[in-house]
Amino acid sequence: MPHKWVPKVYDKSSSAQKIWAEEVISKIKIKGDERVLDIGCGDGKITAHIASLLPQGSVLGIDSSAEMVRFAQSRFPFSSWPNLSFRYADARDLHLSEEFDLIVSFAALHWVLDHRPVLVGIKRSLKPGGRLFAQFGGRGNAGEFFNIVEKLIQDEAWAPYFWDFAFPYGFFSAEEYREWLGQAGLKAERVELIEKDMVQPDRQSLASWMESTWLPYLERLPKELRSRFICQTVEGYISAHPPDGDGRIHVRMIRLEVVAEKP
């Protein structure tokens, strides 16, 4: 069952994702005439940034959330962004034959548990010599925060809502990802886990981040209990990992960064 994303909430609480995506984009040697695919485009702001770098090219953003696609289309209309388009699509079922010079994906693919069909579709969609640049949650991502959540869902007050809960994210190691790239016919150029420091200015910002992205957990709960669950998680995390001297809260994130080429 697809998650019910709230684009405006995500837009306000995804500054870290935007910064990390722009860091990766800055490493790509974009000529300006490429045809680009952005997998998991979300609210569209990163896709629009890419479009601004393509005066003679174009970019297609796809997402499996119809809410996100509608939001992106309304925020970045074709009348103002003629080289930018958005489409509802599932990353596990790509049928875009050799259309793209470049495929990117940021803070999205960890929502997919089996990446093998995704990589097969990416290979199919790239032109020969085309490249993939992706960054998403990797093995150990937000581990300290997950520890708090996992303890909480075992509490007697919350356990009945999670009795059959399975870990919903695909956080993988570099080794297994290199193997999958090879199986899909893609040549790995760089695959590595990198550490990032996600900084939230205060408790409310941390709570908003959880509200916008921890949907597999929150959607298990009645709506009237979600704020309480978020509050208990945030307070538990801050108790174990106090804010710094400026009151900012830090969450250690692990991202898997992937660069590959279609031979």
What is each model feature region?
Residues 37-39, 43-93:
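Class I SAM-dependent methyltransferase SAM/SAH-binding core
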Residues 1-34, 45-49, 68-71:
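Conserved class I S-adenosyl-L-methionine
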Residues 112-113, 126-128:
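Helix-to-beta-strand junctions that scaffold the AdoMet/dcAdoMet cofactor pocket
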Residues 208, 255-263:
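Core SAM-dependent methyltransferase catalytic element
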Residues 102-115:
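A short SAM/SAH-binding and catalytic strip from SAM-dependent methyltransferases
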Residues 92-103:
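A short acidic, Gly/Pro-enriched loop at the edge of an enzyme's catalytic core
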Residues 188-245:
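C-terminal helical/coil "lid" or tail adjacent to the Rossmann-like core of SAM-dependent
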Residues 116, 131-201:
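Conserved catalytic/acceptor-binding region of the Class I
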